[in-house]
Amino acid sequence: MAEGAVFDAQAVTDAVAEGIAKIENASTMEELKAIKTQYAGAESAMTQASKAIGALPKDQKKDAGKLMGKLRADFGRAFGTKEKQVKAEEEARELAAETVDMTLPVNRKPLGARHPLPKLMEDVEDFFISMGWQISDGPEVETEWYDFDALNFGPDHPARQMQDTFYVKGNQAKDAAGFVGSNMVLRTQTSSDQVRGLITRGVPLYIACPGRVFRTDELDATHTPVFHQVEALAVDKHLTMADLKGVLDKLAVAMFGPEAKTRLRPSYFPFTEPSAELDLWFPDKKGGAGWLEWGGCGMVNPNVLKSAGLDPEVYTGFAFGVGVERTLLLRHDINDMHDLVEGDVRFSEQFVMGE
């Protein structure tokens, strides 16, 4: 209805009816907005008719106003009802599109991989804890007395030489036991913590001492200057080699499975007497099942007991130690020590958690 046109009740009624019909057929909010602009916007027939009422004779304005009010109400009611319906349908479609099918297989995120060395350390600690033993964690910078003297190493023993041991320059100490003037070293064995345990914890004593140790070895396929040991010490009345052998057999089974077993070969260590090399029966050995060297062990030397203030006529004890890296190499058929220390993530990925 053009500007200045006369009010045409039939034309505006027909236009509104047409708009309501289109509203009923609309299926999207975009369609509804376009219909509203066309039939109720500023240029629509309904708006133009409302403007034309002002030009009508006074006796016709009232009826024209009522008609326009009814038409606007009808249009608005139809639009509002359809708008709610379309919005509900669109929301339902969006929800359906976002629905997660719980039966579908998921794309699993890669699992993290821990380095196998600390994991094996935890396994060993769990073994001893399961037997009621205590875990002892001593200092890595140690007095020479604890690392050598208390373990029956003579003053001229080759292990004391600077080509075998890292000495901490310019340091002497008075340790907790009151020994003055002892040089400081990076501990060469966790046996030093066994002596600490004897002095500070008393007897009966059953401790395992895992940790890092340091020796002046070159890094190659089988050696590294920083490595890990787990040494164990039991001191009580009436302990024998049979008790030692029983613990070693249990440890072998825990680390390598039910087919694992151990044997002892005579050897010499300053801090044990008698001493033995510890061999492991290894069914998966290349070239066929056989024995492999695993560690060292023996009954605690009476001089070590005396250094801790114990009477060797009353107390006996046994001790043994195994290399954690050595255990790991055997357990997982790793051929080169470099793999353990170079931090290549591809190596750790072989030991993904949960697998």
UniProtKB/Swiss-Prot annotation:
Quote the catalytic activity from the record.
tRNA(Phe) + L-phenylalanine + ATP = L-phenylalanyl-tRNA(Phe) + AMP + diphosphate + H(+)
UniProt-listed GO biological process terms: phenylalanyl-tRNA aminoacylation
**Names of the cofactor(s):** Mg(2+)
Question: Looking at the record's lineage, which domain of life comes first?
Answer: Bacteria
Q: Where in the cell is it found?
A: Cytoplasm
The Swiss-Prot or TrEMBL record annotates one GO molecular function as:
magnesium ion binding
Q: What is its EC number?
A: 6.1.1.20
Alphabetical keyword list: Aminoacyl-tRNA synthetase, ATP-binding, Cytoplasm, Ligase, Magnesium, Metal-binding, Nucleotide-binding, Protein biosynthesis
Q: InterPro entries from the xrefs?
A: aa-tRNA-synth_II, aa-tRNA-synth_II/BPL/LPL, Phe-tRNA-synth_IIc_asu, Phe-tRNA_ligase_II_N, Phe_tRNA_ligase_alpha1_bac, Phenylalanyl-tRNA_Synthase, tRNA-bd_arm
Q: How is the cofactor bound?
A: Binds 2 magnesium ions per tetramer.
Write the protein's name: Phenylalanine--tRNA ligase alpha subunit
- Which organism is the protein's source? Bifidobacterium adolescentis (strain ATCC 15703 / DSM 20083 / NCTC 11814 / E194a)
